[in-house]
Amino acid sequence: MTTSRHLLLALLLAIFSLVVYSNFEADKPASAPLDIKQIAQGLQQPWALAFLPDGKMLVTEKPGRMRIIDAEGHLSAPLAGVPKVSYKGQGGLLDVVLDPRFAETRRIYFSYSESRGDDANGTTVAYAELAQDRLENLKIIFRQQPAMKSDKHFGSRLAFAPDGNLFITVGERYVGMQQAQTLDNDLGKVVRVTREGDIPPGNPFSGRKDARPELWSYGHRNPQGAAINPWSKKLWTHEHGPQGGDEINIPQAGRNYGWPIITYGEQYGGGKIGEGLSHKAGMEQPVHYWVPSIAPSGMAFYNATRFPAWQGNLFVGSLKFGKLVRLQLKGDKVESEQRFDIGRRVRDVRVGPDGYLYLLTDESNGQILRVGPR
């Protein structure tokens, strides 16, 4: 009799688990229809896209080129004045954003992996003035410290806050994962600086002798998505987990986001990371996470009027599955997820001035795709 009860209980638990799992997966169909139009092609590993006031697009290519592309898809010659990058592994010319005061300054801000000698390199951020066919008056405003002998996990996304300060995401460079938990370096951190690279008031560790003053939050792995929520005005980021455990976070001043102490992922090939914890006191939980990994890259909040059904949604690119991921939000929570099949590695996601989404595909013949609901 006891054995029968145990078997019945096990069967009921298995059925319940299957139902819960199925309901969760129902929010994540393998594909859904989109109208997809190719705008441009012939880009080598494009990494980031920014819209200029005239509607043209400024695009970075990882080998170290920056181009201007018009609405018909015509590619300019590479702009002169781009600094030399360390094009190796995951490194190269990476993110680009416009100065919030671009109309008066003509400044663009961009990130790249910079050689530091002795086979070391680091995430570097600079600004320059955009002339017709070149960058002028370049100034470096941030250099990741310390430099590392690694070609992985540069992070490198940039986002301007409403107060004009600049958030920079920095990966832990893979070989420095334990340093994501210490405050005397920039590895595995979100950094906050002024437009000139100075330390703004309100940085949580400013004035501490054991911490770098530019730090905003810590315990990150490799954040390759960053955007300001236009409704809450908060910074949102996403980061790559190891094998599983990609995360979306809302980094707050001075908070610890756990890597590599807590994670929903595991070692490549299987096995615990550290003690195998996913929760620990004093460490923040993600807003959303993915197991298995989707390899997120690029993110954009939809705050345009062309497609009302998308209003208030967050869109994230997927390198691993060739998807565009739509997240429906309620406040600071993710309520549901939908996946659109793009068929290519999606490196960046931006909302265009026309209300369409624009995607960059990560490939040797990279494309700009314009997408909307069908």
Where are these regions (language model features)?
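Bacterial N-terminal signal peptides that target proteins for export
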Residues: 1-8
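Hydrophobic helical h-region of N-terminal Sec-dependent signal peptides
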Residues: 9-17
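Acidic, Gly/Ser/Thr-rich repeat motifs that build Ca2+-stabilized beta-propeller blades
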Residues: 16, 20-176, 225-228, 233-241, ...
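Surface-exposed loop and turn segments in beta-propeller and other repeat-based domains
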Residues: 77-91, 138-154, 195-216, 260-291
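Beta-propeller blade signature
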Residues: 123-133, 182-196, 250-252
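Internal hydrophobic scaffold segments of catalytic domains
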Residues: 180, 231-264
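Loop-centered beta-sheet repeat module
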Residues: 184-193, 202-235
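Conserved blade-ending motifs and adjacent loop-strand segments that build the rim/top face
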Residues: 220, 333-353
